[in-house]
From Swiss-Prot:
Stable up to 40 degrees Celsius. It catalyses: L-allo-threonine + NADP(+) = aminoacetone + CO2 + NADPH; L-allo-threonine + NADP(+) = (2S)-2-amino-3-oxobutanoate + NADPH + H(+). Homotetramer. It is an enzyme of class 1 (oxidoreductase). GO terms for cellular component: cytoplasm; nucleus. InterPro entries: NAD(P)-bd_dom_sf, Sc_DH/Rdtase_CS, SDR_fam. Present with 3210 molecules/cell in log phase SD medium. It is found in: Cytoplasm; Nucleus. The keyword Protein biosynthesis does not apply. NADP(+) binds at residues 18, 75, 102, 168, 172, 201. Its main location: cytoplasm. This is NADP-dependent 3-hydroxy acid dehydrogenase. One of its GO terms (biological process) is acetoin metabolic process.
Amino acid sequence: MSQGRKAAERLAKKTVLITGASAGIGKATALEYLEASNGDMKLILAARRLEKLEELKKTIDQEFPNAKVHVAQLDITQAEKIKPFIENLPQEFKDIDILVNNAGKALGSDRVGQIATEDIQDVFDTNVTALINITQAVLPIFQAKNSGDIVNLGSIAGRDAYPTGSIYCASKFAVGAFTDSLRKELINTKIRVILIAPGLVETEFSLVRYRGNEEQAKNVYKDTTPLMADDVADLIVYATSRKQNTVIADTLIFPTNQASPHHIFRG
């Protein structure tokens, strides 16, 4: 049996919750799951931008008519809304099998001493606190059936800190530490905890970081070939479609011409 067919069988009928699903890696992951499963999955797609989610759902309905999709406008930084969101999912989407904690952001490139307090709070609320809150809300579902996959999106910034990125780096180090601790807490279960740490990926990430400045965002990827969102999505789907006795616990994924945050060949 081919690897693709095995993956499709392992993913068939499963329900996956993806945060930050309206664009970038989240959107690509939704589509990659349906490609890998021949459309035989249920997707819960959560993000702030409902109109983008509805556009994605239309695309899915056309390309994968057998797939079931639930879209939800959700600001993951509003902690009080997380648990009710999970509890009030439609009945056919309640039995979540895979959680992809994808939502994340960076803001600015200020040095310590110049960073706005609200930016510090926003980055940690999104990248760390929300990820923990969603994991805590979904984990009882996994514990009840002794199975499930938790995928946390880390970053090379969570392994190799760099100047002018202190808050983002700190938040991603926190994600790595939380993921490692959680994996150890769940060692006596069949729940898999997976960290995917990308390097340079061309998405809306830099546009958000530089507050809509397109020129600054484009310069991040200038004269090099970054990863694309579907490259990371492919790895997420691969990791969650392995045999139950296997966990791709911690993976760093770079474009070919990158070796660290500031070792990127441009030419």
